[in-house]
């Protein structure tokens, strides 16, 4: 009789645990992650330097079609805008309210089969410019994995991201990158430009990421950390947030701002 009670208790516990697991993910420490939209601490705005990205992804549509004159060959381009929780090192805060069928489609070869997003004509026109990965339906992956946790509608989410990207392109920081295409620059010089725009000490709100090609370090991504309330005008002053301690860039002291076109192997 006692054994039956113990077994019954174990079954009930397993059922309740399964139900709770369905509501959330698991953090790096095994704790439950609440997947309620809007329950996060800050955004990571991931901006890609597309020429360097394309060195390692030459088969992608957006890389095959890239030209030196296109926006993403001369400016940081939108990769993603990720709602983040502190301590969530494995980024389990994702797919908020997304069904299993849609989640199972979240693979590069099936992104274009994910449910179509509701965007205004203006956003639908701008997004392919600022997010070149639109050619591979990256916007679907970014929305269903990350955007659904923002608490925003898809159109507002992408419109805000595009506006911010355009403002960064026009900043001293953005122009420094554009003016040094093909050149080697130092991390400090780039971060100094960021502080010219956003104030002394603002470099603590940004991380630089590099890839290697032909033994050379190439700037591949910039991540800027923002408060939950995004600036409607895209101007970032006063909108920064400190990232989780696990967020660290990997660029060396100096690196190259790659130009469009593939380097010879």
Describe each model-derived feature in a short phrase.
Residues 1-7:
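Bacterial N-terminal signal peptides that target proteins for export
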Residues 7-8, 70:
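Generic hydrophobic-segment detector
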Residues 9-15:
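Bacterial N-terminal signal peptides
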Residues 23-180:
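Catalytic cores of phosphodiester-bond-cleaving enzymes
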């Amino acid at each position: 009789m006692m054994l039956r009670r113990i077994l019954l208790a174990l079954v009930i516990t397993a059922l309740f645990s399964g139900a709770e697991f369905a509501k959330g993910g698991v953090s790096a420490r095994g704790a439950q992650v609440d997947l309620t939209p809007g329950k996060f601490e800050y955004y990571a705005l991931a901006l890609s330097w597309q020429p360097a990205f394309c060195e390692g992804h030459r088969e992608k549509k957006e890389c095959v079609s890239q030209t030196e004159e296109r926006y993403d060959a001369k400016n940081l381009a939108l990769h993603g805008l990720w709602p983040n929780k502190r301590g969530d090192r494995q980024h389990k805060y994702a797919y908020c309210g997304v069904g299993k069928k849609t989640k199972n489609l979240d693979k590069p070869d099936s992104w274009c089969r994910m449910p179509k997003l509701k965007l205004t004509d203006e956003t639908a026109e701008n997004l392919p410019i600022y997010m070149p990965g639109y050619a591979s339906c990256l916007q679907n992956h970014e929305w269903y994995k990350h955007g659904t946790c923002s608490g925003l509608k898809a159109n507002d989410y992408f419109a805000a991201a595009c506006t911010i990207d355009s403002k960064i392109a026009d900043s001293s920081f953005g122009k420094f990158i554009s003016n040094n295409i093909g050149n080697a620059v130092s991390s400090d010089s780039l971060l100094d430009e960021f502080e010219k725009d956003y104030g002394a000490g603002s470099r603590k709100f940004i991380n630089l990421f590099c890839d290697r090609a032909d033994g050379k370090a190439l700037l591949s991504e910039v991540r800027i950390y923002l408060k939950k309330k995004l600036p409607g005008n895209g101007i970032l002053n006063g909108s920064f947030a400190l990232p989780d301690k696990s967020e660290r860039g990997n660029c060396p002291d100096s690196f190259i701002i790659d130009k469009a076109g593939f380097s010879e192997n």
